[in-house]
């Protein structure tokens, strides 16, 4: 693979562009500080403003989210797996 092709598939952490209107709940108090990142693939964003970092077809999506303390994520469901990795801070997960 040529270096130019590799660069098309490289996203540096410092270059991630967040979307603060990715989902309908981003407009509600308590959820309005979330940042959504679509890293590989189009993801599940509901916003035309969402920046897709790597839009080359892969057959999967990788995204990320950032939220300050006490910021809520509304209950929702997926037909695919959703996996959480905590990179920093303290998180509490609840569902049901």
Specify the residue positions occupied by each region the protein language model found.
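A short beta-strand-loop-beta hairpin characteristic of the jelly-roll/cupin
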Residues: 77-96
């Amino acid at each position: 693979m040529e270096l130019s092709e590799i660069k098309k598939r490289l996203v540096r952490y410092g270059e991630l562009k967040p979307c603060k209107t990715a989902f309908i709940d981003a407009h509600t108090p308590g959820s309005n500080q979330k940042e959504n990142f679509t890293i590989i693939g189009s993801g599940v964003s509901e916003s035309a403003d969402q920046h897709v970092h790597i839009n080359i077809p892969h057959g999967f999506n990788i995204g990320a989210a950032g939220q300050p303390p006490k910021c809520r994520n509304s209950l929702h469901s997926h037909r695919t797996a959703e996996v959480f990795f905590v990179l920093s801070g303290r998180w509490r997960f609840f569902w049901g």
